[in-house]
Every structure is written in structure tokens, then in C-alpha cells.
């Protein structure tokens, strides 16, 4: 059995099963597609579940993959042992109703003994205790000796997860020798020691379970196998754990070079090295698959891993961002199998670096506060951090609760997690209430039920509709009617009003009868599909059961439609200019503008903004038809339609297409041709959160209004400057700037002269204390700039000097303290001295040892404060 590297083993496995008629599929993304039960792909079978369940047709009945996987339930244990890791690759061969047990068993044995040349006497096999068929195949057809076979129970050798396909499994173990074992006479396969390593699991999916203990033999049986690539590499390379296999070890060596440490020399250092090595592998692949750091979902998992790795870097002396450098090695070691990493290298590095920088700012403050909390707890003999303290660290300072728990645990301290969770929930409740209050809605929740079919929405094709009032609510209570002047919520059986959703605001308009008018301010809808029209009765009354005419504000709707279509064009343009990592992170579409939040790691340059804007306007000028279709979700995905992460979609979805330039799932209202947008203009680009940017833009008449506003501003500026034309503004502003610069230079020179003149006077009455000249002076009318200039001169003096200079103007005053180098060597500290002097007046201040400033409290006490300087200075300076 010869040594073989990770990349070689991966390729040998996939090639072997290709030779057996399997289709090699590339690894699926770590982000589950269409599976809301998973945060991240955690097994080789997970992305193929749709084929096993008959929800989709596989490209072949035989498939082989090497799947990227992330598992994080034991994240705190990663590093503490060499067994645990969050990232791994799972080799697998799968059959969807094609071959079954004998083929799976035969090929597994052939791959191990013929391709990898593993010694047969080192291999042991387990089967489910009642699976005589598999036992006989292994012993009678493959020839495995019975003393190398073991029958295990349901817990070990029967794969089942609730109801659905299930079945027995067979596992292949490698015997690493008695020197790796526990030394017990009865040590055997299944023992918890390190001698027998489970390498490959073959699952024979042959039953359909109802989840209640009843099993039916399936007509079409499946094979699902899984073998950890890193674990296989451990066996083939003769090493003890994944951190010692070639590709992982090379990553760790990079970390060692940065930290200037060596693995296997110090236990604490080894823990840190394992944490960093594992986590940077996970995060590199996660970012490569489109995960962005955030405070929720998989984005939080990514952020937690990065911050945990950065923290352990600090524990081994790495103070500056460094993980982004290690990304290079992770990609280098995996590029042959995952070439997309090389293409995204610059992007991945940047995301990691930015997150490290952000964490560095957070962690310094958080560590100081947490250290203070832990010190106080020890002094008080307590071992639990209060929920309030943990919440303050998390909410106010952004210090993660899991990091608080981990650091506390290292000192034998726990966190009151229940109280912390309660405070988090209280905050969420307040936020929800604030939102409801701001919405001005009497509809606080969905507790009020409407006993009628859901509202039929006709607004995609009509702006007005004849309808019937099916419910009226006032202050959250159902009523029969509302009268003039009352605010209410009106529910109709059918409506042209678009209900707020997908970031698009709800429609406004009028609901009326010949005798009454209800002005609709906005529209939303309940989870069960009833449209809620919020507004006020302007005239007459609105009564349940009566027929009404519902008409939207058509002009407002048209403006909103322009901005919504613009948001789609904007996302497509951003992906073209910045890259495919751009995804919608939120949006607000109104009649006045569109606000689009998207994933990106840095501010856009002026040139990038210009390119994005030009692309959108180019598509507007091309007059591309905007087509909306309702399609089965599978067909929509085949078209490449972009979905919003976290949004729930049914079997039939609405797809909005702008030619082949933009294809998105969307339930909003849009123009039928891009030409109707007129013009597109970006107003601003800013940061919303780490890794999320925001663009605000306008279209159509909004652009014209913007241009008119610009022209008005320029005309006003020209008039103020007494210019005949706005064309002269730029030149005139440049001239003014030059004049201001010259005046600043003259003021600086004048301040220097004033400073020099005053300096000649203030030393006349200087006292000497312990060999240090102590100077105080009241210099009323002197600006803070001149005071600072004088202080700079004093601190640069060669002789030992302490000076406090004061200036009072009306009810305000300033103090400047300066200490020369020679005075500081004798114990003087400007920041501490000025604090003492200012305190006499009721003021506050401070600063560095050489210079400091303070504000005066009571100006009439400045003289008294200056008189106290001699005594204060004497407390600081000492005789030689």
C-alpha cells in the first residue's frame, strides 16, 4: 500500500466509478438548492435527495461525486481534539433504481484491494445483524474471512431518518494495528479506540418506512455510499488525523510560518493551529460558493468561523489580519479539483480581509469589557456572567455570544443563556412593535380572521375593479360600517390594489360608491391572502356587503413600476460589472425611487458606478420588451431565473424577463418595455452592513426632477456669487478655494506671531519646582489654535517645563497643558495635570503626556485653578 495524496485519491475514486458506468457530477454548492431543511450541505447524499425521493430525474441512474460538506454542531470541539473538523469532502457512488448490493460490495472491495492496493487482511466489514444476504455476499462471493466480519445492531448498521426510503448498511474498516488500540483483550470493530477506522459506508436503501415501525420492500432499490476523503487519506498516508494529511498540513504550515510556531510542540498552540486550519478551509469554500458574512443563517456560520479563527490567531501572537493570506494556500491545494476557487481568489481574499478588519475593531473593545466582567466575577467569587452583561456585549459592542461563552469557559465561567435569550426576544418584540407603530396600522397581527375566500388580485391587468366589501375593521375590531372621518381597514373580494410585498410598496387610491369615498393610503395582505386596504373615510360611510368601485392611483403605480423594472436591470448590471457574487439582499421600490441592497465587499468606485448606470440606460434605450410568465418552478430555474434567498415559492412562480439580460422570480408590477423607464440615475451608493452595499436611484420623471433641482441649486449658487452664468461656477469656485488657502496661510503666520509674542511674556514670573519651571497664564482673547501653538512650542523645549495656559471668552473657556521631554522624565504628565486643574472649575479634559486640553466649567474659577498649578505640579515631579 503506497502513500497517495488527497488530490490523487479523489481523482482515482471518481475515475474508477466512471469506468463502472457512473456519471461524474461536480460538487454541488454548499448552499442547498430547494432544500430549506438544511443551512449548508452536510453530506454527499444531501444534494441528491431529490433523486432518491423521485422529485427530479437524475442525469444517469448511476452517479459518482466528491461533495464539499460543512458540519458545525461541534464547532467548540474543533481544535480541542484532532478528530473534529467543520469542512470535509465526501466521496460517493449512487444508484437510483439501478444496481444494488452485490455491485456496491464488489466494486468497493475492488477499489480498495486492486486500485489502492490495501492489504485484505487489514480490512474488516460490519453488516446489519439481520442482513444475512450482505453477510453471505461478503464471505462467500468476495471471500472475506468470517473473523473479519462483524454483525452490529440497528444503531450502527441501519440507516433511517423518519419516514421514507431506508435500509441496512455495511461499513468497511481499516485495522491500524494493535499499537493504535486500547490494549483491551476484547478490542474489536466498533470499539471507541483508534485501532479500527471506519472508512466507507455502503447504504442499501431497500425499504420504505412509514415512520411507525412498518417497512415495505421497495420495487426500485437504491445505493447510497459515503467515504470521507480526508479519512481515506489518513489511512493511505499512515497519519493519525485529518490535520496531518498532505493538503491540510500544507495549510497549517502556512499558518505556522506567519505565527513563527511549530506544530506538536505546545498543546495550546496546537489547538489554535487546528482551529485556524480547519476554519479557513471551511470559510474559503463557503465564500467561493456565495455565502457572505452576516448576522443570520449561513452568513452567521461563516462569520463565526472567521472570527473564531482570527481570535485563535491572536492567541498565538498574530495581531494583524492574516487569514486572507492563508486563503492563497487553501486555493492552491484544492485548485485542481475546484478551479472556480482560483477564478474567485481575489474576491475571497477581500471578503476574509474585510471581515478580519471589522472583527479586530470589535474584539479589542469586547475583550477589554469581558476581561473586566470576568475580573469582577472572580473578586466576588461568582462563576456566571449575567444575561444582561452578555446581552450588552452582543447588542452594544457586537461581541458574539458564542465567543463570550467560549472565553468564559476557558476560565471556568458560564453564561446565563436563558436570561440572554429572553433579552434578545424582548428586543425583537420591541422591534416588531416599533415597526407596527411606524406603519400606523391598527392591524397588529393576523389574529383577526376573515371568514371569506381570499381576495382575487386583478392589478396585473387592470387599474380599476368593481368589487364587494367582505370585511371592515376599526382599531383591529370587525365592524359593520365606518363613517366619515374614521380610519379603517377595508377588505374586498377582488381588487386592483397591489399589496406591499417583495420590497414594492402597496398601492394607494380610492374605494367608492355613489354616496361615499374611502381614501386608500396603502395596501398589504394577510398570510391567507386577504388584501387589506388602509385608509380613511372621506365622505359617507363604507359598509360590509355593499358593492364598490376600487381604483388605484394610476400615476403613482406607473412610477413604481418604472422603479421596480429598474431594480431588475440594476441587479443585472451590478453582476456584469462587479461579478456573480452580487445578490439582492433587500430592496424598497416606491413611486419616488428604488433602493437596492446587494452583496458586495467594498464601496463602488466612481468608474464602477458610471459603468452600472450606463449599462442600465443602454438597456432602456434598446427598448427591450418586459415579459411576465407563470411557470412551474423547475422550468423557471432551468431558464436561470434568480430567486431571492429566504423567499418561499410555490410550485408555480411568476417570472419577469427583460430579454435574456435579466430573468428573476418576481410578483411585483412592471412596465412592458424598458423604454418606458425613460432615464435612470444613481443618487447614492453606501454601506448597510458588512458585505452589504446600497444603491438608491430614480427613473423617468424622477430624473427630470433631479436635473431641475440641480439646475436650481447651481443657479442659486451663481446668483450668490454674482455670476451671470452657471458656466462660470467651476472656475469661480476654484478661485475662491485658492483665496481661502492663501488666507489660511496668512492666519497661520499671524497665529505664530501672536504665539511668539505671548511666549516672551509668560515666562517672566515662572516658578521652579524640583528643577522644573512651572508656568501658568491667563490669556483672554487667545484662540484655541494659538493656545495649541504655544503648547507645541513649550513641549519641544529642551529645558524641563510644565505650563498651563488659559483663555476665557464669555461663559466658555479652554485650558492647554504642555510638558517638555525633560519634565516628563521627572514624572510630569500633561493629560493628568490638566484634568486636575480643570476639575477645580468643574471642567473636564485630558490627553497625552506631552500635551492635553480641557474645557472650563465655571469661568470665574479659572484664576483659582491656575493658582493651584504649583501644588499640583509638585505632586508629579521629583528631585533628581
PLM features per residue range, with description:
Residues 1-880:
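A glycine- and charged-residue-rich anion-binding loop/surface
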Amino acid at each position: 500500500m503506497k502513500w497517495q495524496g488527497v488530490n490523487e485519491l479523489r481523482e482515482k475514486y471518481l475515475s474508477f466509478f466512471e469506468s463502472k458506468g457512473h456519471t461524474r457530477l461536480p460538487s454541488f454548492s454548499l448552499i442547498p438548492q430547494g432544500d430549506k431543511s438544511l443551512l449548508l450541505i452536510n453530506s454527499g447524499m444531501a444534494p441528491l435527495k431529490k433523486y432518491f425521493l423521485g422529485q427530479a430525474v437524475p442525469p444517469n441512474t448511476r452517479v459518482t461525486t466528491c461533495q464539499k460538506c460543512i458540519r458545525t454542531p461541534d464547532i467548540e470541539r474543533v481544535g480541542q481534539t484532532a478528530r473534529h473538523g467543520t469542512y470535509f469532502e465526501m466521496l460517493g457512488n449512487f444508484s437510483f433504481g439501478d444496481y444494488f448490493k452485490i455491485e456496491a460490495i464488489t466494486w468497493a472491495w475492488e477499489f480498495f484491494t486492486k486500485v489502492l492496493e490495501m492489504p485484505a487482511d487489514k480490512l474488516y466489514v460490519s453488516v446489519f445483524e439481520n442482513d444475512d444476504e450482505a453477510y453471505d455476499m461478503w464471505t462467500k462471493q468476495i471471500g472475506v474471512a468470517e473473523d473479519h466480519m462483524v454483525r452490529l445492531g440497528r444503531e450502527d448498521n441501519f440507516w433511517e431518518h423518519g419516514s421514507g426510503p431506508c435500509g441496512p448498511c455495511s461499513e468497511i474498516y481499516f485495522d491500524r494495528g494493535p499499537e493504535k488500540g486500547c490494549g483491551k483483550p476484547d478490542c474489536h470493530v466498533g470499539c471507541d479506540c483508534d485501532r479500527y477506522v471506519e472508512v466507507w459506508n455502503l447504504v442499501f436503501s431497500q425499504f420504505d418506512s412509514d415512520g411507525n415501525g412498518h417497512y415495505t420492500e421497495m420495487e426500485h432499490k437504491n445505493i447510497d455510499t459515503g467515504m470521507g476523503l480526508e479519512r481515506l487519506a489518513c489511512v493511505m498516508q499512515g497519519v493519525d488525523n485529518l490535520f496531518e494529511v498532505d493538503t491540510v498540513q500544507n495549510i497549517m504550515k502556512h499558518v505556522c510560518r506567519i505565527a513563527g510556531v511549530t506544530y506538536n510542540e505546545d498543546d495550546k498552540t496546537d489547538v489554535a493551529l487546528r482551529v485556524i486550519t480547519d476554519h479557513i478551509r471551511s470559510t474559503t469554500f463557503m465564500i467561493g460558493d456565495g455565502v457572505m458574512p452576516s448576522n443570520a443563517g449561513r452568513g452567521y456560520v461563516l462569520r463565526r468561523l472567521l472570527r473564531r479563527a482570527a481570535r485563535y490567531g491572536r492567541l498565538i501572537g498574530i495581531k494583524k489580519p492574516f487569514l486572507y493570506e492563508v486563503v492563497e494556500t487553501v486555493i492552491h491545494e484544492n485548485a485542481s479539483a475546484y478551479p472556480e476557487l482560483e477564478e474567485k481568489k481575489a474576491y475571497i481574499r477581500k471578503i476574509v480581509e474585510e471581515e478580519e478588519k471589522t472583527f479586530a475593531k470589535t474584539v479589542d473593545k469586547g475583550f477589554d469589557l469581558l476581561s473586566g466582567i470576568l475580573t469582577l466575577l472572580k473578586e466576588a467569587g461568582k462563576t456566571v456572567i449575567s444575561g444582561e452583561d452578555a446581552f450588552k456585549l452582543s447588542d452594544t459592542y457586537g461581541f458574539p455570544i458564542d465567543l463570550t461563552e467560549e472565553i468564559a469557559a476557558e476560565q471556568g465561567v458560564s453564561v446565563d443563556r436563558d436570561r440572554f435569550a429572553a433579552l434578545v426576544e424582548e428586543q425583537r418584540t420591541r422591534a416588531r412593535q416599533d415597526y407596527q407603530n411606524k406603519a400606523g396600522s391598527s392591524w397588529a397581527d393576523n389574529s383577526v380572521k376573515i371568514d371569506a375566500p381570499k381576495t382575487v388580485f386583478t392589478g396585473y391587468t387592470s387599474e380599476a375593479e368593481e368589487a364587494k366589501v367582505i370585511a371592515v375593521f376599526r382599531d383591529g375590531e370587525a365592524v359593520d360600517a365606518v363613517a366619515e372621518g374614521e380610519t379603517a381597514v377595508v377588505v374586498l373580494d377582488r381588487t386592483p390594489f397591489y399589496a406591499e410585498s417583495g420590497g414594492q410598496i402597496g398601492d394607494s387610491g380610492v374605494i367608492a360608491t355613489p354616496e361615499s369615498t374611502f381614501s386608500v393610503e396603502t395596501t398589504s395582505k394577510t398570510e391567507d391572502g386577504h388584501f387589506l386596504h388602509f385608509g380613511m373615510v372621506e365622505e359617507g360611510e363604507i359598509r360590509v356587503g355593499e358593492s364598490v368601485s376600487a381604483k388605484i392611483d394610476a400615476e403613482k403605480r406607473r412610477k413604481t413600476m418604472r422603479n421596480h423594472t429598474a431594480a431588475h436591470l440594476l441587479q443585472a448590471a451590478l453582476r456584469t460589472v462587479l461579478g456573480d457574487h452580487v445578490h439582492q439582499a433587500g430592496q424598497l421600490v416606491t413611486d419616488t425611487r428604488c433602493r437596492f441592497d446587494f452583496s458586495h465587499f467594498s464601496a463602488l468606485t466612481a468608474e464602477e458606478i458610471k459603468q452600472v448606470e450606463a449599462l442600465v440606460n443602454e438597456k432602456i434605450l434598446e427598448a427591450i420588451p418586459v415579459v411576465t410568465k407563470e411557470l412551474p418552478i423547475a422550468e423557471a430555474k432551468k431558464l436561470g431565473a434568480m430567486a431571492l434567498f429566504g423567499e418561499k415559492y410555490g410550485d408555480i412562480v411568476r417570472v419577469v424577463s427583460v430579454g435574456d439580460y435579466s430573468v428573476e422570480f418576481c410578483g411585483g408590477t412592471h412596465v412592458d418595455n424598458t423604454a418606458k423607464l425613460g432615464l435612470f440615475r444613481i443618487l447614492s451608493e453606501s454601506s448597510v452592513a458588512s458585505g452589504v452595499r446600497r444603491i438608491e436611484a430614480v427613473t423617468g420623471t424622477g430624473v427630470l426632477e433631479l436635473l431641475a433641482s440641480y439646475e436650481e441649486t447651481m443657479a442659486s449658487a451663481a446668483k450668490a456669487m454674482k455670476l451671470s452664468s452657471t458656466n462660470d461656477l467651476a472656475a469661480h469656485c476654484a478661485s475662491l478655494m485658492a483665496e481661502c488657502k492663501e488666507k489660511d496661510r496668512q492666519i497661520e503666520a499671524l497665529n505664530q506671531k501672536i504665539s511668539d509674542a505671548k511666549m516672551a511674556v509668560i515666562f517672566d514670573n515662572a516658578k521652579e519646582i524640583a528643577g522644573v519651571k512651572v508656568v501658568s497664564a491667563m490669556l483672554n482673547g487667545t484662540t484655541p489654535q494659538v493656545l495649541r501653538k504655544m503648547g507645541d512650542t513649550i513641549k519641544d523645549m529642551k529645558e524641563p517645563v510644565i505650563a498651563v495656559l488659559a483663555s476665557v471668552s464669555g461663559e466658555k473657556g479652554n485650558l492647554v497643558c504642555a510638558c517638555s521631554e525633560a519634565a516628563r522624565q521627572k514624572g510630569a504628565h500633561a493629560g493628568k495635570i490638566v484634568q486636575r486643574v480643570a476639575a477645580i472649575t468643574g471642567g473636564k479634559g485630558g490627553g497625552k503626556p506631552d500635551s492635553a486640553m480641557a474645557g472650563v466649567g465655571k469661568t470665574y474659577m479659572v484664576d483659582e485653578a491656575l493658582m493651584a498649578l504649583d501644588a499640583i505640579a509638585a505632586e508629579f515631579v521629583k528631585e533628581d
